[in-house]
Amino acid sequence: MSHEKSFLVSGDSYPPPNPGYPGGPQPSMAPYPGAPYPQAPFQPSPYGQPGYPQGPSPYPQGGYPQGPYPPGGYPQGPYPPGGYPQGPYPPGGYPQGPYPQSPFPPNPYGQPQAFPAQDPGSPHHGNYHEEGPPSYYDNQDFPATNWDDKSIRQAFIRKVFLVLTLQLSVTLSTVAVFTFVGEVKGFVRENVWTYYVSYAIFFVSLIVLSCCGDFRRKHPWNLVALSILTVSLSYMVGMIASFYNTEAVIMAVGITTTVCFTVVIFSMQTRYDFTSCVGVLLVSVVVLILFAILCIFIRSRVLEIVYASLGALLFTCFLAVDTQLLLGNKQLSLSPEEYVFAALNLYTDIINIFLYILTIIGRAKE
């Protein structure tokens, strides 16, 4: 349908169409025939509809006379480049009058003004999140800074040393019975197979407590497994001590006690961090195992004394490391829940030191 037919109304005078888009040429067109009013040239838009005027309008300032409409009509004055006019309307225009302006002062960058200050008690105040409930980590039984609390640390140390004292008491009693009671000493010497049974029980208990973290923290099963390990290892130590001279056993117990107390006190007082040497100690254990295999094939009293001396020195270093892990004031530390694991480490260190010292004394007296 052509542009002219879209504006035809039967028996009525029609106003001229609006001009086209700005920026393009304004072709002249002949006025409509028979029209009593002058027509303005226009350029059709791409969609067949008249565009919005921008720039000076060619129409008369008084608007289009529409018969019975008031002379004021709807003015179609020139539009400013910025958009719609904001000035006051003529008397015959809209009854609202001039549009109200924004209460904020004009801002050249178009940014709104800052919001007025709010009441601190309002939920939208800036300090609302600072006054909220504490975080989840503040309500834990063992927060991230639990080692800073001396009471927790001291309670953990007391529990570990209490368990260790009970273990050493059982072992010392077993060694005393196997050393001073002749009937028991004769029985264990004749039944060597009991040593291998106790060694198998000890090995299984050691693997369970060392590798199963959830199990060794589960009460009371952790204490049950630790008790089984203590009894089996005590039987092994007592059986080994029964093959040595009574004087050698007493000397080994005394030297072990002195060495352990000295190392523990030194580890508590020194500033040197032994926990940073764990990797070196693990490599040394591998070397010591290879040395032990060599001693099996090469039967030499001197070689066995050297092997026992290196083993005693190595587990003395392990005792220092485990003591500092217990104290928790170095690079590495144990959790307060690991009291069974801490007691196990200290106990095995002391027993190995005793066995190596007993080997040194026994081989030296031969």
Curated annotation (Swiss-Prot):
Record keywords, A-Z: Membrane, Transmembrane, Transmembrane helix
Biased composition (Pro residues): 14-44, 67-109
GO cellular component, one term: endoplasmic reticulum
Compartments in which it is found: Membrane
Transmembrane segments: 160-180, 192-212, 223-243, 248-268, 278-298, 302-322, 341-361
InterPro entries according to UniProt: Bax_inhibitor_1-related
Coiled coil residues, start to end: none
Membrane-topology annotation of the record: Multi-pass membrane protein
GO BP annotations listed: apoptotic signaling pathway; negative regulation of extrinsic apoptotic signaling pathway via death domain receptors; negative regulation of neuron apoptotic process
Region Disordered, residue ranges: 1-141
GO molecular function, one term: calcium channel activity
Primary role: Potential apoptotic regulator.
PANTHER family noted in UniProt: BAX INHIBITOR-RELATED (PTHR23291), PROTEIN LIFEGUARD 1 (PTHR23291:SF16)
Protein name according to UniProt: Protein lifeguard 1
Species annotation: Bos taurus
Lineage: Eukaryota, Metazoa, Chordata, Craniata, Vertebrata
Gene that produces this protein: GRINA
